[in-house]
Design a protein with these regions (language model features):
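C-terminal catalytic histidine-bearing segment of alpha/beta-hydrolase fold enzymes
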Residues: 312-326, 339, 348, 355-450
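Catalytic-loop region of hydrolases
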Residues: 1-99
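Alpha/beta-hydrolase active-site loop
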Residues: 139-143, 149, 166-189, 211
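Glycine-rich nucleophile elbow surrounding the catalytic serine of serine-hydrolase chemistry
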Residues: 174, 201-214
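Short, surface-exposed "cap/lid" segments of acyl-processing enzymes
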Residues: 80-147, 158-160
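Short beta-strand/loop motif that positions the catalytic acidic residue
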Residues: 334, 339-346
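Gly/Ser-rich "nucleophile elbow"/oxyanion-hole loop immediately N-terminal to the catalytic nucleophile
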Residues: 94-97, 102-103, 181-203, 220-224, ...
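Alpha/beta-hydrolase-fold enzymes
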Residues: 211-295
């Protein structure tokens, strides 16, 4: 895929200055109300990844327990799925007051935002004072903290953009990669163009991470991505929406449709033509709720009761089939090695969808190790897979661990001495987080480990 429009200059606009903003220890505003998120005049003239402004921020566990890390937020120039210039925010994190090791790696971690509502964006949900109960990124801090504790720099982008475009194609990858570009140019992080970069995300974050890995060869070939961990990625959002309708997880169907209608005029027209007023109200409400509340409110919701034709028939109309084809993962092969992890008995994302994504990569000579866990389900595997993901990334940062084992079925990834050591390490990190103690390495010796 080409990105010829991405570096276009706008000579009629002056180049905006890079500027630092003061946070003044204030209660964070929602992104839609925070002027920090609004790009300055002339930002379109800058290349993707250019930092427009930055600010120091305090991060917190569930918005309440201030974390002992160094963190900034960067507003940077990026592109939409239609290659229109826009601005996005990434939150970059370092261990507090730890001397930078030689060749510190950068991890691009993607949260499972899984919502349209901006209270679920990690740039808001992870801040001290955020009122974001029910936002999934708050539950992912243990994984982020575990990476910080290793001395890694971490970039956590708002990969859905400022409009909350959940399950939109391609543009999550653009925002993630441009967030990496922004982080690598941000002097306080001590990174440079030779910095090794890893990608990691689970569920909705695994989907966004897949887009970053798929878009990187054409969009950001200069970034040295050494590996990507794709945990339980939403491989086929269209099939997911159909499968979850009327189930305990049908809130995700509502959120997905509410998001995609913003991105595709043809889909929006079909929805307006066939879904009744009550169904429209459900979609409107889903766009305002966090993931947990939407899931609880719309559990068992059956959109067949709100369509003048069956949902299956509605979703086979050409305008909608085209959308579903567009959002399906595996249509571009990543250049980096990948570790895909998925539960065999996932109650949300069908393992067959992920099998198909992996097969599409392998058919195009992609470098994939695929681990299928027979004991876990979707929610538990997020934490249970963390030691495997972290150790695999550690090896990739060191330049090892590139065997191309295509399919690795396991009874449980938790049943190994290495996994147990990993869980104990994460538990110790979380204890430090709860006590607001430093997360990073503290000794001169540990400062040089990856």
């Amino acid at each position: 895929m080409t990105t010829g429009a991405t570096n276009e200059r706008k000579p009629e606009q002056a180049r905006p200055p890079r500027e630092e903003w003061e946070t003044r220890d204030q209660v964070p505003l929602l992104p839609s109300r925070d002027p920090f998120y609004q790009p300055p005049v002339g930002f379109r003239a800058l290349p993707p990844g250019a930092v427009l402004r930055w600010r120091r921020v305090d991060l917190a566990l569930f918005g309440r327990i201030r974390q002992h890390v160094d963190a900034w937020q960067l507003l940077y120039r990026t592109n939409s799925m239609h290659h229109e210039p826009e601005a996005a925010v990434t939150t970059v994190v370092l261990p507090a007051r730890v001397r930078a090791p030689a060749h510190r790696p950068l991890l691009a971690y993607q949260c499972a935002i899984d919502a349209v509502a901006d209270k679920c964006f990690p740039s808001y949900a992870l801040r001290y004072g955020a009122r974001a109960i029910g936002a999934v990124p708050q539950f992912e801090w243990p994984l982020i903290a575990a990476a910080v504790a290793r001395g890694w720099a971490v970039s956590i982008s708002d990969h859905e953009g400022q409009d909350g475009c959940f399950v939109a194609p391609r543009e999550p990858g653009y925002r993630i990669l441009d967030g990496v570009r922004a982080a690598m140019s941000f002097e306080p992080l001590g990174l440079d163009q030779s910095t090794p970069v890893g990608i990691w995300g689970y569920s909705g974050g695994g989907m966004a991470s897949s887009w970053a890995a798929e878009m990187a060869p054409a969009y950001a070939p200069e970034i040295g991505i050494v590996g990507a961990v794709l945990g339980a990625p939403v491989s086929d959002p269209g099939q997911l929406a159909v499968r979850l309708n009327g189930t305990a997880f049908s809130g995700l169907t509502a959120i997905g449709i509410a998001s995609l209608r913003r991105c595709y005029a043809g889909l929006d027209a079909r929805i307006n033509a066939h879904i009744d007023a009550e169904g429209q109200q459900i979609l409107a409400a889903a766009s305002q709720l966090d993931t947990v509340r939407a899931g609880a409110r719309f559990a068992k919701q059956d959109f067949n009761n709100h369509c003048d034709i069956s949902l299956a028939e509605l979703l086979t109309q050409p305008e909608i089939v085209e959308v579903f084809d567009d959002v399906r993962l595996g249509q571009h092969v990543p250049a980096c090695p990948m570790l895909v992890i998925h539960p065999q008995h996932d109650q949300i994302i069908d393992v067959r969808d992920v099998d198909a994504q992996v097969q599409r990569y392998l058919a195009a000579d992609g470098h994939v190790s695929y681990v299928r866990d027979h004991c876990s389900e979707h929610i538990s595997l997020m934490l249970l897979s963390a030691p495997l993901a972290l150790n695999w990334l550690k090896n990739r940062f060191r330049g090892t661990g590139t065997s191309n084992a295509q399919n690795i079925p396991v009874f449980s990834i938790a049943l190994s001495a290495k996994a147990i050591r990993g869980y104990l390490s994460i538990l110790a990190t979380m204890l430090r987080a709860v006590l607001a103690r430093p997360l990073g390495p503290t000794t001169a010796r540990s400062q040089h480990r990856i």
